[in-house]
Amino acid sequence: MDPDGAGTLREGATGPEVTELQQRLLRIPDVYRDGATSGSYDPTLTAAVARFQLWYGIRGDETGVYGNDTRAALESRTAPVSG
């Protein structure tokens, strides 16, 4: 079990959940500029998550890790991603 909670994503993760994260971050100005929606949690995505956490004062997750606190903050600022 991940200490940051179920559904936590971090560098090295892949899949549709990562793609959704990438798509949501692209909607926040200047956080993930020109970022890929490849479904791969790479160093660029880690930096974008860390930037989002810093800019919005999210402290409940490790820096660059998409845990429960970061997920809640991002989802509250972006509409659901349509498949």
Residue ranges and their predicted role:
Residues 45, 50-83:
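Extracellular LysM carbohydrate-binding repeats and other cell-envelope/extracellular binding modules
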Residues 1-44, 81:
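Acidic, Ser/Thr/Pro/Gly-enriched interdomain connector segments
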